[in-house]
Amino acid sequence: MYFTEPFSDAERAVLSRFFTNTDRPVFALINMPEVVKGALFARYSRSPKSLRRLFLDEFYDRPETGIEAIAESVAGEDNPSLRIQRAESLYERVFSEYGDDSVAQLGGAHLACEQSSNLLTKVLEWGRLAAYLEQSTRYIYYDQKDDGRYRYLTPPEIAGTTLAADYNAEMEMLFDTYSKLVRACAAHFERKYPKEPEVSGPVWRSSIRAKACDAARGLLPAATLSNVGIFATGQAYEAMLIRMQASPLEEVRQYTRMMLQELRYVIPAFLRRVDIEARGIAWSKYFSGVQSQMEDTGSRLAAQPAEVAEVSLTEWDPDAEVKLIASALYAVSGLPDDQLLALAKKMPAAEREKVLKQYVGDRKNRRHRPGRAFERVFYRFDVLSDFGSFRDLQRHRMLTLEWQRLTPDHGYNVPDAIEEIGASGEWHAALGRMAELYQKLNSAYGPDVAQYAVPFAYRLRYYMHMNAREAFHLLELRTSRQGHADYRRICQEMHRLIREKAGHRLIADAMNYVDHNEYDLERLDAERRSEERRHRGAQAQSRTS
């Protein structure tokens, strides 16, 4: 089911000192400085390479990482199983004093999760209290093959069945179309946006590639393979694995077992409960039981979905701005909450506006976020967007977000660039074939497995319930120039609805880094800044060497 990356004997000898295995898609990072782990994961998200190959090619033999010196000391140590036994003994003593949950919050692990479908990545990234870096579709062309096939998963439910050949053939055709159109988009953008003299070649080419990848990504199916780097505490991993055990997808359940195996090399005692029948297994059964009951209840709803806009503001507090003023004054007043609310209601509008401006302050950039008083204000948005945009917005975890199953039922988006290169016919044909494949899979294996066939261009319904402080972060970040045009449009509309539908003019206007402008080469400025940072880093390194 998984491609095994080839390494030489010498490479495996190096890798075995820093990773818990050299031949499986899930592995933990060991014996590395924390800064190296972070840098490795950061590079990982923009590279087509596996983490182990990236480590060998770009990190291992660089003296500034200190990796080679660590490798020499590790080579002389006792075997890993003995070190784990010693750690277990220590953890047992600590647990007896402080309890499992308290200690499990303080120990963590870096885990690489490779060859994950884009259904699995959403399950991995569900938990709030963890850090994730996922391979981006905007910096990598998915037109290369591993071991003779494109980078997609044939789910265990389908592999070896009579539908497997049809499934694989349709996937190959879809990726053939993607490969053709992503290169055609790149050539089109090169003609449309020729390199200007003041822009370096690498910056221009990176911007062109990002725009082409953005335009063509709608053809990538949910079965597309990705890599995810995770850093989480033992407690967060436990919650993740227990939730994954309850999944209806065999890929997710198989991955759970692989993750548990690797994590037990590095934080074994934190994960003792996961596969114990009376503890983690019972917990997983609770999740699956509730899901089964709700599926049954949901199937009896007779209503058909109404026609709605791409973004709807469905709930907000009409008194939000008054409550915000009361909360802003709470920490500096010495007055009880209800008394402050009464005072805020009596304030003239001009005075409330003055207090709010003082509380927001003079923001020099979007990272200067105002305080927690904004967390008293909330907004609930119902969104019907392409799955590709959902993948980006779903990464925001300081809010409540739930989604429905991915299906072809809500139609799909056609990017302007596809029309411009005269490829709309191929786009429609490819997506139509995948809708037919979805129906076959749905009939044979049910709607959960059928999701693998649905490309990113198809629309998915989800809600996002957030407080105003998180709205500052999300809307200002996701409308910035370098963002994908589709999710920029969604977040621009959220901002407009806060101001115009909710009538929260003061709050919306305080989000002064929300960008409603439109751009051509969205990544150009960001790539310029990246190049400048690389140059400064190289100069600093040359001065110290």
List each language-model region with its residue ranges.
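A conserved ligand/cofactor-binding region detector
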Residues: 1-545
